[in-house]
Amino acid sequence: MEALSKPKGKFGQSLQVRLVSDLEKSQRYYRDVLGCKVDNWGHAERDGMTIILQQASSQEDVRPNALSKKRQDYPTDWEGPKFGWDTYIHVSWDDFDLLVEEIRGNGGFIAVEPYTDTHGIWEFKNTCIKDPDGYSIVLGSMREF
């Protein structure tokens, strides 16, 4: 007799929480540069991206991610990112250039200029922007060859 599997609950949307050094400055950045709707709670939302901005108690609490260790066991020849990622946002291939130019036009800091790479049967476009506290927001797109 086959054992009955137990029902499992479903996770909902996950949100990133970001400790920032100056809440008002960060709210302006996410609103004016990234085009987010920002509420008084500190939620910065645009399309499928939501980041919760919270005032850090001290500057030492603001800690963007460091570069991750390289790995040899990815399914393709990729070993990992070349810089620290705090947020990775998938965008469509067609929207990628539009978003980069919008952010650049709004005064956003493009820390890593857009580049294209390949892994197996996939072509990728990535860029990295930095917010006022140095958090890396990677915009990435992919398509099959």
Say what each PLM segment does:
Residues 1-15, 34-92, 98-130, 141-145:
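Vicinal oxygen chelate
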Residues 131-137:
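Short, glycine-anchored, charge-dense loop/turn motifs used at functional sites
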Residues 26-31, 103, 134:
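Conserved active-site tyrosine of GNAT-family acetyltransferases
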Residues 17-19:
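A conserved hydrophobic helix/loop-capping motif in glycosyltransferases and polysaccharide synthases
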